[in-house]
């Protein structure tokens, strides 16, 4: 059989494979941590640099926009150039750009840094996943490795605000960026000695598809940007509508071009495989259902429980604990009972956690939330099985494609979930609050608008006017909107579990490569 892939993993011992996995897991941890750590640094950054409201949004959003746009082309680039070189280059860029924060004296400079960090992240994130596919050719070992990879991603996202809060208690906002530097140095040095190189052979590595690159970047960035705009400004603005139509058009052209190509940047035909489709649907829709609920949980802890952002991060740890406990055993359960049982069941367990928040959440207590978060984390651990399904029927030469698709599904699910379910929560909050009942007390015009926009705004208006009842009703309305959104998220996850169950072949064994 002709090999289209050049790799140096054949002689790797078991010890070297698992040591390499540690490097890849730490790499992913750092990048996902960086996606959330800025939340803690933003208030101090705003006080020092005084960015405009628009600049603040770009500081927050530019990272995810660039990540979404560049993941597919840069994963294809890594396949051709070499995954090890791409990963180490990504980390070198990650460290150098983070170090440049020392020279940041304007919001524009910080935006540029976040842009370059997004490029580096797009080199790192899919490459960690595709290298696991190359290093662990035994499907059973690979499933366990993917569980570790999944844990690293979850822990990074949860610990970002916690680490950020701890740093900011002692240092300036710059530390939220500088924390990346030692991790980047360690990753580059360790990667040089511990990671194997792998890339497409010359027979398979053809010329670079520039039109597909442009279509992918512009289409994905346009799609993510427009969805974010809808969630912030509503549906009335015409510009996001124009952008989303153009973005979808470019994505459709990209798909058609790659379907007709003998050497596609993204092999769209992978979606014809039921296990691949099941894994990607699970990744996208689970993040869609979860993202807004977790964001609202953080707000609930800060507004209702009156915790600092740092303590709120600590109080979200039960979810990470649930994930860490169950992710390592999920592949073993899937090997014994089959992914057709384990993945839908895991998603169902996460749904139960959501339902608990609703049915025992009037009002919600932290003990109830903690139990729900443990179940959500335990259920999310089953997504390691989704990763195994995605890689199971993916040939080694298409590992970069599969990794890019999976990462894109997580990112898009997060963006769409926050936009759609976040907007639902805001709408329910306004319905439950009934601000008109406070008109007789002077809460009209701009004051009423601020109170209706968010629970934080309502609390501030209540403090300014001395109307304590407004704060109490706003908090109650936010609580009810939050748990109602959790109910909707749980229903979505039940539907996902059924769809995934129907898609996964009954006899599929994740310990045997297709």
Curated annotation (Swiss-Prot):
Membrane topology of this protein: Multi-pass membrane protein
Bilayer-spanning residue ranges: 24-41, 58-75, 87-104, 113-130, 147-164, 173-190, 208-225, 238-255, 279-295, 316-333, 342-360, 370-387, 409-426, 482-499
Compartments (UniProt record): Cell membrane
Annotated SUPFAM superfamilies: MFS general substrate transporter
InterPro entries to which the protein is assigned, alphabetical: MFS (IPR011701), MFS_dom (IPR020846), MFS_trans_sf (IPR036259), Sugar_transporter_CS (IPR005829)
Positions on the Cytoplasmic side per record topology: 1-23, 76-86, 131-146, 191-207, 256-278, 334-341, 388-408, 500-514
GO biological process: response to antibiotic
Keywords: Antibiotic resistance, Cell membrane, Membrane, Plasmid, Transmembrane, Transmembrane helix, Transport
Family matches, as PANTHER family: MAJOR FACILITATOR SUPERFAMILY MULTIDRUG TRANSPORTER MFSC (PTHR42718), METHYL VIOLOGEN RESISTANCE PROTEIN SMVA (PTHR42718:SF47)
Function description: Confers export-mediated resistance against antiseptic and disinfectant compounds such as intercalating dyes, quaternary ammonium salts and diamidines.
Protein name as it appears in the record: Antiseptic resistance protein
Gene expressing this chain: qacA
């Amino acid at each position: 059989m002709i090999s289209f892939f050049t790799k140096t993993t054949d002689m790797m011992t078991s010890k070297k494979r698992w040591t390499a996995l540690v490097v890849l897991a730490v790499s992913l941890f750092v990048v996902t941590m960086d996606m959330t750590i800025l939340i803690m640094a933003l208030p101090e950054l705003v006080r020092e640099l005084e960015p405009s409201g628009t600049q603040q949004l770009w500081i927050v959003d530019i990272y995810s926009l660039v990540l979404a746009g560049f993941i597919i082309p840069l994963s294809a680039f890594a396949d051709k150039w070499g995954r090890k070189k791409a990963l180490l280059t990504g980390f070198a860029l990650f460290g150098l750009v983070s170090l440049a924060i020392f020279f940041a004296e304007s919001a524009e400079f910080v935006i540029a840094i976040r842009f370059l960090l997004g490029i580096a992240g797009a080199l790192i994130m899919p490459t960690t996943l595709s290298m696991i596919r190359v290093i662990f050719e035994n499907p059973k070992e690979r499933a366990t490795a993917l569980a570790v990879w999944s844990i690293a991603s979850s822990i990074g996202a949860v610990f970002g605000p916690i680490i950020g809060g701890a740093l900011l208690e002692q240092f300036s906002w710059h530390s939220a960026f500088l924390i990346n530097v030692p991790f980047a140095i360690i990753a580059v040095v360790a990667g040089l000695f511990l990671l194997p190189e792998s890339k497409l052979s010359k027979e398979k590595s053809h010329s670079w598809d520039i039109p597909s690159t442009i279509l992918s970047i512009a289409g994905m960035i346009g799609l993510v940007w427009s969805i974010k705009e809808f969630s912030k400004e509503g549906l009335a603005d015409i510009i996001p509508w124009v952008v989303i139509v153009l973005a979808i058009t470019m994505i459709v052209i990209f798909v058609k071009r790659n379907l007709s190509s003998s050497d596609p940047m993204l092999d769209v035909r992978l979606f014809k495989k039921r296990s691949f489709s099941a894994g990607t649907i699970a990744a996208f829709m689970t993040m869609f259902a979860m993202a807004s609920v977790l964001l609202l949980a953080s707000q609930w802890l800060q507004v209702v429980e009156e915790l600092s952002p740092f303590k709120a991060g600590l109080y979200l740890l039960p979810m990470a604990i649930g994930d860490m406990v169950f992710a390592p055993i999920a592949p073993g359960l899937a090997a014994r009972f089959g992914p057709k049982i384990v993945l839908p069941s895991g998603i169902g367990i996460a749904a139960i956690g959501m339902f608990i928040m609703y049915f025992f959440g009037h009002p919600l207590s932290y003990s109830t939330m903690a139990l729900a978060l443990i179940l959500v984390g335990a259920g999310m651990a089953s997504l390691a099985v989704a990763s195994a399904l995605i890689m199971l029927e993916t040939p080694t030469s298409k590992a970069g494609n599969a990794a890019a698709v999976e990462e894109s599904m997580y990112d898009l699910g997060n963006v769409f979930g926050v936009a759609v379910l976040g907007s639902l929560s805001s709408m329910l909050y306004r319905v439950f609050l009934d601000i008109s009942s406070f008109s007789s007390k002077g809460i009209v015009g701009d004051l009423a608008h601020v109170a209706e926009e968010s629970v934080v705004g309502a609390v501030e208006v209540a403090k300014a006017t001395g109307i304590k009842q407004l704060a109490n009703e706003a908090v109650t309305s936010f609580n009810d909107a939050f748990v109602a959104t959790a109910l909707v998220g749980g229903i979505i996850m039940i539907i996902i579990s059924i769809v995934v169950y129907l898609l996964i072949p009954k006899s599929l064994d994740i310990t045997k490569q297709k």
